[in-house]
């Protein structure tokens, strides 16, 4: 099915074949989980080229492709296979191929090389049932990790302690790793939207923003919760309530048929109406799947239309330099008539 859809896209882009070098796209199209190899797909043929280390693995994991072990360089093997396929124009993934690599391909491959982008990424936006099973499990593990960490956080421990405990807990649940460098931003560091865990000690009266996820079977979850350690100030509680109301409004309103711009506007307009528009400077959300950030974007620039089986985050935040910040994030699945939450952790302000 994936090859059929890809071949339809090749026609649209007027190329005879696509050279897949982006590792996420390679995994999506072939199921191969190793770290070296490229795929070349034409209208009638599909070949996967890898080296001695991965031939056996490729033969086990990949269906529908010829597996070729390159003896010369991988680029020379691509040139050879392209000749055999008799293709005139090959699309290459311009957003992924470094210029130096392109020069080597240009020198060896006789077919015309045409820069293309977003072909496989577009297919990846709409999830299959198999993908959704994995994404839901990744979300559940993140929820369980949040429950666990709430009993661990206390004054005097560092942000790094919290990040390490989160990662260790998730790995014990069978994940490969966290989805990305875990964000633990306490106190005034909460004003940093991407405040990766530091050696700062967590103190009483602070809010702590936890942004993390699980990389499970190749797919990721991405959840954010902000908790209080001891009683927070009225100001901090106030921005918490605004952020939560904005996030809940977006969850209620987002449905298929709207653009990323429209989906972004619900939380943004609400936060603006409360006087914090300037303090919410990032987009409302992004697609999740094999990558932490993929299409579609829920942002003031995104024309992409939401359709069922897309999976996205909804994560408004308010950041006050010198004071602190709040972000609340869930992963959702776009359904036929609205959306379904994949992350279910409580969003009331927990006082730990």
What kind of region is each of these model predictions?
Residues 1-352:
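Active-site neighborhoods and metal-handling regions in enzymes and metal-associated proteins
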């Amino acid at each position: 099915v994936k090859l059929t859809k890809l071949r339809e896209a090749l026609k649209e882009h007027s190329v005879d074949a696509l050279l897949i070098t982006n590792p996420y796209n390679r995994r999506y199209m072939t199921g191969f989980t190793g770290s070296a190899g490229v795929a070349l797909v034409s209208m009638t043929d599909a070949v996967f080229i890898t080296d001695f280390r991965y031939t056996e693995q490729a033969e086990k994991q990949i269906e529908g492709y010829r597996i070729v072990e390159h003896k010369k360089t991988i680029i020379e093997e691509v040139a050879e296979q392209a000749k055999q396929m008799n293709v005139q124009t090959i699309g290459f993934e311009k957003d992924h191929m470094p210029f130096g690599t392109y020069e080597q391909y240009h020198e060896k491959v006789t077919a015309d090389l045409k820069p293309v982008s977003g072909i496989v990424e577009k297919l990846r936006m709409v999830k299959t049932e198999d993908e959704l099973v994995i994404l839901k499990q990744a979300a559940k593990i993140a929820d369980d990790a949040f429950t666990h960490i709430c009993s661990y956080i206390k004054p005097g421990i560092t942000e790094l302690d919290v990040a390490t405990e989160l990662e260790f807990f998730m790995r014990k649940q069978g994940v490969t790793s966290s989805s990305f460098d875990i964000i633990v931003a306490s106190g005034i560091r909460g004003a940093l939207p991407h405040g990766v865990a530091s050696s700062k000690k967590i103190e009483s009266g602070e809010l702590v923003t936890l942004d993390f996820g699980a990389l499970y079977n190749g797919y990721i979850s991405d959840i954010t919760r902000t908790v209080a350690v001891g009683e927070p100030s009225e100001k901090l509680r106030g921005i918490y309530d605004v952020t939560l109301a904005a996030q809940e409004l977006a969850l209620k309103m987002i449905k298929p048929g709207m653009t990323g711009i429209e989906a972004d506007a619900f939380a943004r307009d609400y936060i603006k109406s409360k006087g914090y528009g300037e303090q919410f400077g990032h987009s409302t959300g992004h697609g999740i799947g094999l990558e932490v950030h993929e299409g579609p974007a829920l942002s003031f620039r995104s024309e992409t239309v939401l359709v069922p089986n897309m999976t996205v985050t909804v994560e408004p935040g308010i950041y006050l330099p010198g004071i602190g910040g709040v972000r609340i994030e869930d992963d959702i699945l776009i359904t036929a008539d609205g959306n379904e939450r994949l992350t279910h952790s409580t969003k009331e302000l927990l006082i730990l």
